[in-house]
Amino acid sequence: MTLESKSTSSTKKKKSNNFDIYLASSSPRRSEILENLKVNFEILKCDYDESNFTDESPEDFVIKNTQQKCLAAHAIRQQKKLPNKPILTADTIVALDGKIFGKPENKDHAIAMLLEFSGRRHSVMTCVCFGETDPQSDTEVSMMFDLVRTEIQFANLTANQCAKYWETNEPKDKALSFGSLVSQYFAH
């Protein structure tokens, strides 16, 4: 477990108490969002097995994953006796016909996934969880969460289009290889 300070001021401070929340995520995109919002935060890395809720609906899966990440981060913070600050977690999944699609393992896997979505409507779900620990007990965690679901219709895709998209390097660490450039393949 490591801490990494992210400050929006011109001088970055490492391992200080001068931050507002913990971000329990290693996602560069989530860090970028908080930086753009001028939130002072520290990254609290916690290893959490996201396969615990594989029998759940996509909605329940993403909600439970986000909440459990928050509880896991709280346990690490408490174990390491770190300052009691709120914890922010998030998770994004892509689902088609009730099946959850994760990050691609390689180029061939990414192309196969994208072709499965070709010409079809699917859901992108993001859950954000904000957890606070009771300052008196430092054990009870109160959590608030919100789930946003977006329905997206893909245009018909060819294997060549999918391969070219993979070569942009954008999709390699995202659920369903889903980066901003993929929007060119949405049916309008």
Please describe what each predicted stretch is.
Residues 28, 48, 135:
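Short, glycine/serine-rich, charged loops/turns that create anion-binding
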Residues 18-44:
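N-terminal G-site helix/loop of the GST-like fold
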Residues 2-6, 10-22, 35, 57-188:
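Anionic-ligand binding patches
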